[in-house]
């Protein structure tokens, strides 16, 4: 269906977009893609992103969605009289803070994402790394002399619960919480969770959505393709810093399984499709 004001050139361009995507759809059909949605990227274009995820499922791909929720967790901490504290970018997670993490990720953000996917025509199942359990973790312990509390590092991934959801034709929506051997829940970096899941699932792609264009080099320009050696140099020089460091390290870790990792700007409408189904892409592709 076209609109009365739509020109023939615009209609032809729509068809050309579909034709351009066809080789990529053929290449990735039946393949697993792990996509991490950060809290900072959950903005006005969230529905456009979720439409992309639903479309990928409909054309035969197997998307897995991992979500964080840092800004929302901090917001609820403050509402409940708890002061957010960070050490080297890691949230200090005492008992009350862990309760907030679980409440926000599994009681608010996860269900909202699942509901939006259903509204957009897809089928999704909300999960936590505790379910199955999917993510077995160990306490991270201290950072810079500070006790991080219930912050975990992934020890083992059980991919079976996620694969079962994928085999049903549904989209797993996974909160970045893991289960410790002590039976306690732990807060785990969502980039790390996505990378470890990508390896365990033998995924073809890992995509990390963030709120910047991608990785920038020493000259401040966007790096379209980043290899491991260059990434190490940029981290050592300080060109890659702050929250981008764990993203790049996660992207590199996933290369044990995936053909390429991608760090893209979640604020750009349909950035996921642009990165995966067009020749040029819109972010940084990380390769060996």
Label each PLM-derived region with a short phrase.
Residues 1-267, 276, 280, 287-288:
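Nucleotide/pyrophosphate-binding catalytic subdomain
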Residues 273:
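Conserved N-terminal glycine/acidic-rich loop preference
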């Amino acid at each position: 269906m076209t609109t009365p004001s739509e020109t023939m050139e615009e209609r032809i361009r729509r068809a050309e977009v579909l034709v351009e995507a066809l080789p990529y759809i053929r290449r990735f059909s039946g393949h697993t893609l792990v996509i991490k949605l950060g809290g900072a990227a959950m903005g006005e274009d969230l529905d456009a992103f979720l439409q992309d995820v639903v479309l990928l499922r409909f054309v035969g791909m197997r998307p897995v969605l991992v979500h964080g929720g840092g800004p929302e967790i901090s917001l609820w901490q403050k509402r409940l009289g708890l002061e957010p504290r960070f050490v080297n970018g890691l949230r200090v997670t005492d008992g009350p803070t862990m309760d907030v993490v679980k409440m926000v990720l599994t009681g608010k953000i996860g269900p909202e994402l699942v509901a939006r996917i259903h509204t957009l025509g897809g089928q999704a199942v909300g999960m936590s790394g505790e379910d199955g359990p999917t993510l077995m973790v160990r306490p991270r312990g201290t950072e810079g002399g500070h006790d991080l509390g219930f912050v975990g590092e992934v020890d083992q991934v059980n991919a079976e619960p996620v694969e079962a959801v994928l085999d049903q034709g549904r989209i797993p929506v996974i909160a970045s919480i893991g289960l410790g051997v002590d039976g306690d829940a732990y807060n785990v970096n969502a980039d790390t969770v996505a990378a470890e899941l990508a390896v365990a699932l033998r995924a073809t792609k890992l995509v990390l959505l963030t709120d910047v264009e991608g990785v920038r080099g020493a000259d401040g320009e966007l790096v379209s393709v980043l290899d491991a050696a260059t990434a190490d140099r940029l981290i050592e020089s300080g060109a890659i810093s702050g929250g981008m460091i764990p993203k790049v390290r996660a992207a590199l870790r996933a290369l044990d399984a995936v053909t390429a990792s991608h760090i893209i700007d979640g604020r750009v409408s349909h950035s996921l499709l642009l990165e995966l189904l067009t020749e040029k892409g819109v972010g940084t592709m990380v390769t060996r």
